[in-house]
């Protein structure tokens, strides 16, 4: 028996050491944690249970095979809640994916889905394992299939802590959220050398697919961190807002509160910018707002927060950037977030101060019509509780797109200063009273007078409230309490839709 035990411990040690002590040391010298260190830091203390540590490639020669085949898989807890996690081990074949490597990931994904718990992938891989040829590509296909199959069933989170190139990038792209470590995390389909050879363009890996690029330019990633530990801490925080799966909700007791500061945060002058995140923080429970994609499409803000201890998703116009107008990227950013919240029964709050869709030739030529329609589609198809708070401007088609009553909002509140109209009062007055303004002895004075007249008669919140497009006009300071009450009332909302296979969102 002792001989068997000794053999077991030897094999276990081999599995835990991955590519060996020398390669583990090299990993740390690059400022990177090892695969197992990452898992240990991410999960609750002593909660990780490994699965399939002794699996190895059945394709490579005996001399080439290594226990675990370059990926550590298993389950544990985060804040006491079950999660499933895999971590690619760069010290084994450079983390390259082969048949067995893929089988381990697929088995874990299936297990996570059966048990209705989130899955987290810690990516650090050189890509497909060339030695295994098409078997590696087939492995990617099986992973992609499960990413799609379990989308909306369990939360899927990707963490890019090293290279992620070629076909490997499509699995993270199919998941719900992507975190990236600065300096070490990189994603691209074709690397710098291939690009230079094919197109003649010269670029380094960081400028092509680093965390900064994907968080601010491409919009492929949602979060970044200076260190791996900062990134993994962010994953833990994100999960605290999410249900285990798309079939569970966790209602919490309501709490009333008054926030007088809200009376002073939004300038009365509709042309003056301000940071809507200050408004969000006053509406939400203290220190609960968790922004997503803060560096991409800054003219719209998305994120999670708690309202009376209940987790909600927030979509908000950001007047600090482009006056809060809707653009192609803003519409895409918000639409994807709305669909995630709907898939996992997370209520939605829309904080609106929108002057319209951004005018411009590039916006039109690049498809603002189609992209704006995605936002409309996402709001209209969502059946979770949906509440809108209009805090200043709500103009034109953008007003309709930002969760208006017409496309399915359950409740719409407006502040007394809100302006809800086909267009801004100045533009409307210029059209309606064009002849009168031109004939006036003082056109500028007449224009100001007509603008004020139009604003008073047509653009205030009372006209919309009289037509039933606004459910109530409320004071800024009472908004938090009213929103808590609204979401509490909507806790058991059910909404039947026509039966169909699926809609055709304008991709």
Swiss-Prot record:
Q: What is the lineage of its organism?
A: Bacteria, Bacillati, Bacillota, Bacilli, Bacillales
Q: What would be an example GO MF term here? A: ATP binding
Q: What's a BP term from Gene Ontology annotated to this protein?
A: fatty acid biosynthetic process
The name this protein carries in UniProt is Putative propionyl-CoA carboxylase beta chain
User: Bias regions of kind Basic and acidic residues — which residues?
Assistant: 1-25
**Segment Disordered: which positions?**
1-30
Q: Which family does it belong to?
A: Belongs to the AccD/PCCB family.
- Tell me the ranges covered by the CoA carboxyltransferase C-terminal domain, including all copies: 256-501
Cellular component annotations (GO), alphabetically ordered: acetyl-CoA carboxylase complex
Enzyme Commission number, as recorded = 6.4.1.3
Its recorded reaction(s) are: propanoyl-CoA + hydrogencarbonate + ATP = (S)-methylmalonyl-CoA + ADP + phosphate + H(+)
């Amino acid at each position: 028996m002792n001989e068997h035990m000794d053999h077991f411990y030897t094999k276990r040690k081999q599995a835990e050491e991955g590519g060996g002590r020398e390669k583990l040391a090299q990993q740390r010298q690059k400022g990177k944690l090892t695969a197992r260190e990452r898992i240990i830091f991410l999960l609750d203390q002593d909660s990780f249970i490994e699965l399939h540590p002794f699996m190895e490639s059945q394709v490579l020669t005996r001399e080439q095979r290594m226990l675990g085949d370059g990926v550590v898989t298993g389950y544990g807890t985060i804040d006491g809640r079950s999660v499933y996690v895999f971590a690619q081990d760069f010290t084994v074949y450079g983390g390259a994916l082969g048949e067995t490597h893929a089988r381990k990931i697929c088995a874990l994904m299936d297990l996570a889905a059966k048990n209705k718990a989130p899955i987290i992938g810690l990516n650090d891989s050189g890509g497909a394992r060339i030695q295994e040829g098409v078997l590696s590509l087939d492995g990617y296909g099986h992973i992609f299939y499960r990413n799609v199959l379990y989308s909306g069933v369990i939360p899927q989170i990707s963490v890019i802590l090293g290279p992620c190139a070629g076909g490997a990038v499509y699995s993270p792209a199919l998941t719900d959220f992507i975190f990236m470590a600065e300096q070490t995390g990189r994603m691209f389909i074709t690397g710098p050398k291939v690009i230079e050879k094919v197109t003649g363009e010269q670029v380094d890996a960081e400028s092509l697919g680093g965390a900064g690029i994907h968080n601010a330019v491409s919009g492929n990633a949602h979060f970044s961190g200076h260190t791996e530990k900062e990134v993994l801490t962010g994953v833990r925080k994100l999960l605290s807002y999410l249900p285990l799966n798309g079939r569970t909700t966790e209602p919490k007791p309501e709490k009333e509160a008054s926030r007088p500061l809200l009376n002073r945060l939004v300038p009365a002058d509709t042309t003056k910018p301000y940071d809507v995140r200050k408004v969000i923080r006053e509406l939400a429970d203290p220190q609960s707002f968790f922004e997503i994609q803060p560096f991409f499409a800054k003219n719209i803000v998305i994120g999670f927060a708690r309202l009376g201890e209940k987790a909600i998703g927030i979509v908000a116009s950001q007047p600090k950037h482009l006056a809060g107008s809707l653009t192609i990227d803003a519409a895409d950013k918000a639409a994807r977030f709305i669909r995630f919240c709907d898939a996992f029964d997370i209520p939605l709050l829309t904080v609106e101060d929108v002057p319209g869709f951004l005018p411009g030739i590039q916006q039109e030529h690049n498809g603002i019509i189609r992209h704006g329609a995605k936002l409309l589609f996402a709001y209209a198809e969502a059946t979770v509780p949906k509440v809108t708070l209009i805090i200043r401007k709500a103009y034109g088609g953008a007003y309709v797109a930002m969760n208006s009553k017409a496309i399915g909002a359950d409740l719409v509140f407006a502040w007394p200063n809100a302006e809800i109209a086909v267009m801004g009062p100045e533009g409307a007055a210029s059209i309606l009273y064009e002849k009168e303004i031109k004939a006036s002895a003082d056109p500028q004075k007449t224009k100001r007078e007509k603008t004020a007249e139009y604003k008073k008669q047509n653009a205030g919140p009372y006209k919309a409230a009289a037509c039933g497009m606004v459910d109530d006009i409320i004071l800024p300071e009472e908004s938090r309490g009213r929103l808590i009450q609204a979401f509490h009332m909507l806790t058991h909302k059910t909404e039947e839709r026509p039966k169909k296979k699926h809609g055709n969102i304008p991709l």
